[in-house]
Amino acid sequence: MAAKIRRDDEVIVLTGKDKGKRGKVKNVLSSGKVVVEGINLVKKHQKPVPALNQPGGIVEKEAAIQVSNVAIFNAATSKADRVGFRFEDGKKVRFFKSNGETIK
């Protein structure tokens, strides 16, 4: 099955503590989760690694979020949108369901 959300897509969070926030997808995991820039920040307690010259401490980083909790952001309508697939010139492309516009 083709992925409706891909890396570098701009998405909006639908549920949870970051509801309504927008960000760019950094990574899509095979477990049905995505990592979004600046969304779902968690504090990780990191041990120092002297061999790599990394200091220890509390590091803030993005955690994965379920792909069902995000929707692709349509800049033309400034709203969350759904994704469809169609064939154009023999290639399968994604499009916004609300206005039919092709996604990059």
UniProtKB/Swiss-Prot annotation:
Keywords: Ribonucleoprotein, Ribosomal protein, RNA-binding, rRNA-binding
Subunit (UniProt): Part of the 50S ribosomal subunit.
CDD domains (UniProt xref): KOW_RPL26
GO CC terms: ribonucleoprotein complex; ribosome
Name used for this protein in its record: Large ribosomal subunit protein uL24
GO biological process: translation
InterPro entries (alphabetical): KOW, Rib_uL2_dom2, Ribosomal_uL24, Ribosomal_uL24_CS, Ribosomal_uL24_KOW, Translation_prot_SH3-like_sf
Function of the molecule: One of two assembly initiator proteins, it binds directly to the 5'-end of the 23S rRNA, where it nucleates assembly of the 50S subunit.
PROSITE patterns found in the cross-reference section: RIBOSOMAL_L24 (PS01108)
SUPFAM superfamilies found in the cross-reference section: Translation proteins SH3-like domain
Family, per entry: Belongs to the universal ribosomal protein uL24 family.
The gene coding this protein: rplX
Pfam families: KOW (PF00467), ribosomal_L24 (PF17136)
Sample GO molecular function, one term: rRNA binding
